[in-house]
């Protein structure tokens, strides 16, 4: 993107740093994941988990959730002020799974939030290490993106369920900061804005008074974040209109839905980061790896290399396919829920199946599920190649505007075409080009009509051997141009429920 000079890299957002050079960024990201690893090791010691139990992804998720809950200031304050039956606002916990007499048993643990905060700070040189917390949030968000569908949420806000590829980061908490904003898809931002506008329509005081002023600032900030994701002048101009509206209402909702649809072809820039479960960083730290000294990047070879050497286990329900469970977690680790399956399959070195064909449910186990029949398996998280993660939408012809596909937001910077069904997308754009945004709408539609599904994106970019850490020899894969690869076709996944 042209404005690259003014932007901080994701790693800087992630670590809250000012402008740094590459070495400093690598060191501060290393410090961040090292802190997560140290926290995890300490928690395993506190709970006296065996090596095997400490490598169980479900245990990792419980501990990640505990530390996120311990630092959730707003929710903690709310819980203090609105005491609910059976919930101690000062405590946090969750299920820990242990191996006893050849069976897995669930044990519910409860800790003081203060104690968890102490352990976390101690692992992070006495600091709050918000960046590490955000990193965990993004890992949970990526896992949700791979596991659940958001059809109901899309329909509720008046959007089309086929726009699911725009929904990256839709389950991220509000407090996820700049790093969180960078990974949110266009659809996610549109949905947040529509919810806000709808509240304003239903509640007369929403935009008024001191609170209303703060609301207005938040609204304009969200508009600017979304504007920054668009890569064409017309889309950005429309966002200015939405932002400057005196009294946002249905006209703005219409404009936003129009923009979301347009992003299926004129894709937005959405960042992708490989955020791994805490236990993976813990294993590396425990084996003596010094992340801060070695340096680390979320968008290069490092996460691939880490997964190459980590053994992580998962609980498996009786009728689940362990290979499918591994695929789900692999996609989550690389933030590849919305990537073209042809590209993901090539990188992973095994065929990745669309979600409708997976025999697996989510990774987390509900409290009412029977543990007696639970088994555990090694997750296969290794890859054949590695590739650089992208923050662009993969638009061709001078990165302005090009082919998209209902259901791809590229993760890897790898040359391919982005096939799409133009008729399907364009059908959504009948008529309505009047009103104050008419010229922009006309311009956007014109750009979409001139997009060709056979255009190549990420020209000349390839994948790399895992031995090629300096990315010197790109291997440019050739894909069957006609066969599109969306993860969501024929989808039967569960809805995400808060």
UniProtKB/Swiss-Prot annotation:
Belongs to the influenza viruses nucleoprotein family. A motif (Unconventional nuclear localization signal) lies at residues 1-18. The lineage of its organism: Viruses, Riboviria, Orthornavirae, Negarnaviricota, Polyploviricotina. A motif (Bipartite nuclear localization signal) lies at residues 198-216. Late in virus-infected cells, may be cleaved from a 56-kDa protein to a 53-kDa protein by a cellular caspase. This cleavage might be a marker for the onset of apoptosis in infected cells or have a specific function in virus host interaction. Residues 1-21 are annotated as: Disordered. It comes from Influenza A virus (strain A/Silky Chicken/Hong Kong/SF189/2001 H5N1 genotype A). It is found in: Virion; Host nucleus. GO terms for molecular function: RNA binding; structural molecule activity. The keyword Ribonucleoprotein applies. GO terms for cellular component: helical viral capsid; host cell; host cell nucleus; ribonucleoprotein complex; viral nucleocapsid. Homomultimerizes to form the nucleocapsid. May bind host exportin-1/XPO1. Binds to viral genomic RNA. Protein-RNA contacts are mediated by a combination of electrostatic interactions between positively charged residues and the phosphate backbone and planar interactions between aromatic side chains and bases. This is Nucleoprotein. Keywords: Capsid protein, Helical capsid protein, Host nucleus, Host-virus interaction, Ribonucleoprotein, RNA-binding, Viral nucleoprotein, Viral penetration into host nucleus, Virion, Virus entry into host cell. InterPro entries: Flu_NP (IPR002141).
């Amino acid at each position: 993107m042209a404005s690259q000079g003014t932007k901080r890299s994701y790693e800087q957002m992630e670590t809250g740093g000012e402008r740094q050079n590459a070495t400093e960024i690598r060191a501060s990201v290393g410090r961040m994941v090292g802190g997560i690893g140290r926290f995890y090791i300490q928690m395993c010691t506190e709970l006296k988990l065996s090596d095997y139990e400490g490598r169980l992804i479900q245990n990792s998720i419980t501990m990640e959730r505990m530390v996120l809950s311990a630092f959730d200031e707003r929710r903690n304050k709310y819980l203090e002020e609105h005491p609910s039956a059976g919930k101690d606002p000062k405590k946090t916990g969750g299920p820990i799974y242990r191996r006893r007499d050849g069976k897995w048993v669930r044990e519910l643990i409860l800790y003081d939030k203060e104690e968890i905060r102490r352990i976390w700070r101690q692992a992070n040189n006495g600091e709050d290490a918000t960046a590490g917390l955000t990193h965990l949030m993004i890992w949970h968000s990526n896992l949700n993106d791979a596991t659940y569908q958001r059809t109901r949420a899309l329909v509720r806000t008046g959007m089309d369920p086929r726009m699911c590829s725009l929904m990256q980061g839709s389950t991220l908490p509000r407090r996820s900061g700049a790093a969180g904003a960078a990974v949110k898809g266009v659809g996610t931002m549109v949905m947040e804005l529509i919810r806000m506008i709808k509240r304003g329509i239903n509640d007369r005081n929403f935009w008024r008074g001191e609170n209303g002023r703060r609301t207005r600032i938040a609204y304009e900030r969200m508009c600017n974040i979304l504007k920054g994701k668009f890569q064409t002048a017309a889309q950005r101009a429309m966002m200015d209109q939405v932002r400057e509206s005196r009294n946002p209402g249905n006209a703005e909702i219409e404009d936003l839905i129009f923009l979301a649809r347009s992003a299926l072809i004129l894709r937005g820039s959405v960042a992708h980061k490989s955020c791994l479960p805490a236990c993976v960083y813990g294993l590396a730290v425990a084996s003596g790896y010094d992340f801060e000294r070695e340096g680390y990047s979320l968008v290069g070879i490092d996460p691939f290399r880490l997964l190459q050497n980590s053994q992580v286990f998962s609980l498996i329900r009786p009728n689940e396919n362990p290979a499918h469970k591994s695929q789900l977690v692999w996609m989550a680790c690389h933030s590849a829920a919305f990537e073209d399956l042809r590209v993901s399959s090539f990188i992973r070195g095994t065929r990745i199946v669309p979600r409708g064909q997976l025999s697996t449910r989510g990774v987390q186990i509900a409290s009412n599920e029977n543990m007696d029949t639970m088994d555990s398996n090694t997750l296969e998280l290794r890859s054949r190649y590695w590739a650089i993660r992208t923050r662009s939408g993969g638009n061709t012809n001078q990165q302005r505007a090009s082919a998209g596909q209902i259901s791809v937001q590229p993760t890897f910077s790898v040359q391919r075409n982005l096939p799409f069904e133009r008729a399907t997308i364009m059908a959504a754009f009948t008529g309505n080009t009047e009103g104050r945004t008419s010229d922009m709408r006309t311009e956007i539609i014109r750009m979409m009509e001139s997009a060709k599904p056979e255009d190549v994106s990420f020209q000349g970019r390839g994948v790399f051997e895992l031995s090629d850490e300096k990315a010197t020899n790109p291997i440019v894969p050739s894909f069957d141009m006609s066969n599109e690869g969306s993860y969501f076709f024929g989808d039967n996944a569960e809805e995400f429920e808060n």
